[in-house]
From Swiss-Prot:
The gene is tmk. The keyword Ion transport does not apply. GO terms for cellular component: cytosol. One of its GO terms (biological process) is dTTP biosynthetic process. This is Thymidylate kinase. Its EC number is 2.7.4.9. It catalyses: dTMP + ATP = dTDP + ADP. GO terms for molecular function: ATP binding; dTMP kinase activity. Belongs to the thymidylate kinase family. Disulfide bonds: none annotated. It comes from Nitrobacter winogradskyi (strain ATCC 25391 / DSM 10237 / CIP 104748 / NCIMB 11846 / Nb-255). InterPro entries: P-loop_NTPase, Thymidylate_kin-like_dom, Thymidylate_kin_CS, Thymidylate_kinase. Phosphorylation of dTMP to form dTDP in both de novo and salvage pathways of dTTP synthesis. It is an enzyme of class 2 (transferase).
Length: 230
């Protein structure tokens, strides 16, 4: 039986976000998914947070350099909010309105986890920032790539080679364990939007799980269904 086509708002692009700890493989899996969607004749762009737009990329440099941490969790949250506001209004929303799929490496859940759960920024502050920056924008699907902390940090170290760890990679092991737990809690609280995928496997196996998650939610079009059978 053929997979379901998109629902009533089929002219709107789909918004897929990828979340997870350091070294979980988000960037790689986003690239694989984008290539598969494009092969299925679906327009898709890849973007990231913090960053994704010229203004937001400037802020990305600041926060990953550690400047945000020196200013404190509330100020760092404001930096992320400023970056997200620019990103949403100049990249994400315009693309979705044109029927383009947007695949984003991190989004609002990362702020909830890093600055909220681990930085102790109050939920009221985060809610206010989301009202300003994203309004009613919500991902159609959030893929949370889950790997053991030690595996993720080893991958991150291998990826950067001789380079210094960024502001978040440099945190201690306890921080990263809390991070993993926080993402699992978000998934449990919003199972209709979120799917947790075991990413401690080879690239093809993880990519297949991501693709299956899209089908489970009837997000892919008939063209994508045909491509999956090729």
């Amino acid at each position: 039986m053929a997979q379901a086509t998109p629902k009533a708002d089929s002219q709107r692009g789909r918004f897929i976000t990828f979340e997870g700890g350091e070294g979980s493989g988000k960037s790689t899996q986003i690239r694989i998914l984008a290539e598969r969607l494009q092969a299925a004749k679906l327009r898709a762009i890849v973007t990231r947070e913090p960053g994704g737009s010229p203004g937001a990329e400037i802020i990305r440099h600041l926060v990953l350099s550690g400047v945000g941490k020196l200013l404190g969790a509330d100020a760092e949250t404001l930096l992320f909010a400023a970056a997200r506001d620019d990103h949403v209004h100049t990249v994400i929303k315009p693309a979705l309105e044109q029927g383009i799929w947007v695949l984003c490496d991190r989004f609002a859940d990362s702020t909830r986890v890093y600055q909220g759960q681990l930085g102790n920024v109050l939920p009221g502050v985060l809610n206010a920032m989301e009202r300003v920056t994203i309004g009613d924008l919500k991902p159609d699907l959030t893929v949370i790539l889950d790997v053991p902390v030690e595996v993720g940090l080893q991958r991150a170290a291998a990826r950067r080679g001789s380079g210094a760890p960024d502001r978040f990679e440099a945190e201690d092991i306890a921080f990263h364990r809390k991070l993993r737990d926080a993402y699992r809690a978000i998934a449990a609280s919003d199972p209709q939007r979120c799917v947790v995928i075991d990413a401690d496997a080879d690239l093809d196996a993880v990519a297949a799980r991501v693709w299956a998650a899209l089908h489970d939610r009837a997000l892919t079009a008939d063209a994508a269904t045909k491509a999956s059978r090729a």
